[in-house]
Amino acid sequence: SKLYANLYKELMVSFPVMSDICIQNFNSFSALFDNIRYVSEENYDEFCIVNKENSKRRAISSFFVHLMKEGVIEASKIGNIIVNLCDKFIEYISKEGMKNQVDEICENLFILIKNGIETIETDGSLDDVHDQITSFVENVITFKTKDYKSFTSKTLFKFMDLEEFC
């Protein structure tokens, strides 16, 4: 994604329409997290489609965070997406039957935070956002899976891995 982001930035210089396309796609990025689906392996064809959707969502997260690092997307916009996903995560962990959605949000948070927290931290105007993100990660690693209906050990360990980047 880093290579693609670099290439895309160069294409934007030669083809200004690429900038408009980037903005349109970025503006619809948050909506990708409104319809996270889960299908059991029993329906294999649909299961494969959902896995592709998840892979695409993660690739787009990586692409946009690398565009931020290239200066194409403002750090505040990625910061806002991270904060919104943190809120969605907290909302979902208390609901029954949301383990897969929580895991998918966690995977994307991992990508966005791991690759973007340094850029957010160096932007002096985003101290509050940086503090909010790091506090969120520090809090999540204290959670107990038994206290939340849709919080798995897999998600907890992913956040423990993420702590080293915050």
Model-derived features with residue positions:
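Alpha-helical interaction scaffolds
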Residues: 1-166
